[in-house]
Amino acid sequence: MRRRGGWRKGFGERLGRYSTKFKQAISNRDVIWLHAVSVGEVNLCVQIIKALQPRLPNIKLVVSTPTTTGMSELHKKPPAEVGKIYYPMDRRGYVRRAFATIRPKAVVLVEAEIWPNFLWGLQSRDIPH
């Protein structure tokens, strides 16, 4: 993150801290959290969003990515009402804070990456993934 630059962008989100605007957008809503790492996964996520939105109109979709390139692609493609956040660093406290804020009903990992603390958090909260 530091070598490529841009590490300050979304730094709070990487620690599981989200803006008031984001918190308001997801409050009192059922959330499905989609996670995409690469630009290719972000593009695949856009297709998933297009399929889910008409079927689940009352669900708030949130997409996360750990990279600045993934985030710039996210801002170009999905509809504005889709939440876009940086993925929290896979440390127990940051992940716990993210879950406490987002409270997802389900999580879609676009590809099988190994995120141990995130996966343990899903399992301990009985969140389908």
Language model feature labels by segment:
Residues 2-129:
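Active-site and donor-binding regions of nucleotide-sugar-utilizing enzymes
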